């Protein structure tokens, strides 16, 4: 499974990053705004799971479901 976090370092991005780390979910982080815009992302954080983008709410739900919490 490929997990990518698109982040600008905003407070919500940092919260999601900490949640991922606390659950030992490995991910790559992309901070290049041009890449985000080219993918059509107009807000962050976005967590991409195997090519499927999730907004913050969806991402936190995915993390909780994946880890049984």
Residue ranges: model-predicted function:
Residues 39-47:
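Structural micro-motif
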Residues 37-38, 54:
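Short secondary-structure boundary/hinge segments and terminal tails
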Residues 34-35, 51:
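Positions that flank functional sites
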Residues 18-20, 42, 68-69:
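Surface-exposed beta-strand edges and their flanking turn/coil or helix-capping segments
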């Amino acid at each position: 499974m490929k997990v990518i976090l698109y982040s600008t370092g905003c407070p919500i991005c940092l919260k999601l990053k900490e949640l991922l780390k606390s659950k030992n979910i490995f991910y790559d982080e992309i901070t290049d705004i041009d890449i985000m815009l080219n993918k059509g992302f107009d807000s962050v954080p976005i967590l991409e799971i195997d090519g499927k983008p999730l907004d913050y709410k969806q991402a936190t739900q995915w993390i909780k479901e994946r880890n049984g919490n």
